[in-house]
């Protein structure tokens, strides 16, 4: 596939989305209930696939390293304001980066206490942290336990798989240190803090070996992430013609191992969500389905942004021009980039709408739909892989249900 180089110009969609017209026709935004706080804008790893530091958007360079107490307090106030306005009684905050643990224990404690104090006792607030694992010492895990913060760790499986990408600035792999940290997190008194493992797929890694390497830590959940890319800059190994579907093959191997186990060893969220969609449920997931986006990102300077993964499209793709000092989260909900991702089928391309699987795949992860000519009004660059994977899983589930005299729900693709 040959396409022109990326530019800085805003794409036609969703910039041209007419939010005012949609509101006049009766659409009302779905309130947010999840907030990603970029508490530190730098990292102590230099992963070669990182969407923050290795993407077209380099705005992180202008961000302050940490969120000041003033910005933190204003962010907490804005979150509380939004939850109160919309009567939301359960919400989540993810401390993110960069590497969030670079802020240190004092700032971490202040951040958590500020957030809890702002939302008050009337809101059940779930606090979590996504880390590369390098700073998960016993003492820090004790602190996270005291603060009630669950932990997700990024790791790509075995040593060779992990260290191929997840290295320090000096080129040294991080696998041994992350494994030691996971040993502390996954056992004993720290086990209740364990949230999930996050693994980016690399086609060079054996899928079953990768999955089983992750299973050695008995994670409550595993998130397999498709490498970020789009029609302009396709991910590694994607076949532009759609004749080969290597990512479907990779995930199918994981599915067979996971689905065929005697007992459910862990939740593989992508596959659990796919099964739920095929059975007629509506799980909340960014990767599949049509559920409205209900989260926002706050940078260290207080800027309100869209999903960080949009940075892989072009410089400025995630920016909104809004910030917590001057704008509410309600204002963010009316930004075309956020609003369009709450419109379900109305925001899908004509190609997607003509496909019988569109309610299951939802067009694919939003960031992977980008093309310079049409913006995000396209199927995912993973369209062929998603189609193949959904078809295989559907046939397997239909056969199993049929063996027990229970067909797939009529609404399933």
Regions found by a protein language model. Give the residues of each.
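Radical SAM/AdoMet-radical enzyme domain recognition
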Residues: 72, 76-94, 103-227
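Cysteine-centered iron-sulfur cluster-binding motifs in ferredoxin-type domains/subunits
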Residues: 38-46, 99, 352-354, 358-359
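Short, non-ligating residues that shape and space the ligands of small metal-coordination modules
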Residues: 56-57, 361, 392
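Radical SAM enzyme [4Fe-4S]-AdoMet core and its adjacent flexible, acidic
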Residues: 164-176, 183, 187-304, 309-321
